[in-house]
Amino acid sequence: IYYFDAKVISKGSGASAVASAAYRHATKMTADRSGVVRDYSYKAKELAHEEITVPDNAPDWVIERYQSGSVAEASERLWNDVEAREGRSTRHQSARYARSLTISLPIELSRDQSIDLMRSFLKATFADKGMIADWVIHDIDANPHAHVMLTLRSLGVDGFQLTNRDWNKVSNLREWRFEWAAFANDALERAGYDLSLIHISEPTRLLS
């Protein structure tokens, strides 16, 4: 089954990046700016894997804050940092926090094979372009799928910088969907399956 959906998590739609991360990591997180606590630990049985992928050339502060401690703790720091940065923006009322992807994983692949697939895809498609990818795999009732939250601002030596407008191009969604099919099909072939996911265009969802 091919499923690849992209949307933006924004303040204008009433969403919280920290709450969204708490749901994905099936844990309890606190949004520093609002003080709101979200606890999704009751969903822990669905969580199969969690990881944060950063660019190879990421500044030291990114490594220190988001590649240390537990993944859930690093995720909480990451999205609190993002919300704090957007809170300083002149357009904070319409702040855009993250790009969210939901991707169906081939059921033919093992857990380790799915993890390797996601690592390769996220590094090549997003991290190598400068984004941080906070991702998890949920698996319940034989429905393995990945949730990904991507940062929207470029990384500077001392913090998040300007929003990277190139990442908002509508053409990106078509490219990402095509690349996912290519990566997944390669993983299936290497696992010994004569199967292919077919990339079929869907009505384009605006990325901004």
What are these regions (language model features)?
Residues 1-208:
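N-terminal nicking endonuclease/strand-transfer module with a His-rich metal-binding environment
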